[in-house]
Amino acid sequence: MANKRNYAKELNTLIETFTHEEKRPTLLLHACCAPCSSAVLEKLTAHFKITVLFYNPNIYPEAEYQKREAELKRLISEMPCTKEVALVDLPYVPEEFFTAVRGLEHIPEGGERCFACYKLRMEAAAKYAAGHHFDFFTTTLSISPLKNAQKLNEIGEALAEEYGVPHLPSDFKKQEGYKRSIQLSADYNLYRQDFCGCVFSKKEREAKAHLSLIHISEPTRLQLIS
């Protein structure tokens, strides 16, 4: 069995190489939300000239999309390390998400539906990066403990082959990246959503919350009966 790749270590090795060669490559960074972007931007801005791409047609409803978009803009405007960071905001077209996941609607969170969503958003990043001559592209998604870093990197590498722009390997949750994102979210008073983004994850989250309420209330009901 092949050894599991350490994407965080691969990224650190690349950064060391760029530092030694006194290079600061351009990077198109797909961002899913402000909390996930915070620690990633803090880690990368010293080593890359970053443009953030906000393309997330999966987010539901539109008010949620607008809230996450506004928080990302605020974060970029307030973090000291992001003074040179640009933001590209692609149109919000939810139909693109529903087309990408058609037939996968009933698959549980974390499965093939999510992988199709990863690809949709990362492909938009790869296309934009190729069209605007970036040195690399990647996504903030791997900072979440709920996101499959191996799958994200596999998708990124396949898209790199297809579009001719290198994918920057990453597993941003490693080396306490996720923990740092929580701290930065508190420091900047960021809105931290309680579901991934799509209508399916929202419904799944609400169903789990409902079951939790039932379990909590059951002892109370039994006490009343006795």
Label each PLM-derived region with a short phrase:
Residues M1-A39, H47-S217:
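Nucleotide-activated chemistry modules centered on ATP-dependent adenylation/adenylyltransferase
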Residues L44:
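Aromatic pocket-lining residues of Rossmann-like dinucleotide-binding sites
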Residues I214-S226:
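Single conserved hydrophobic/aromatic residue that forms the stacking wall/gate
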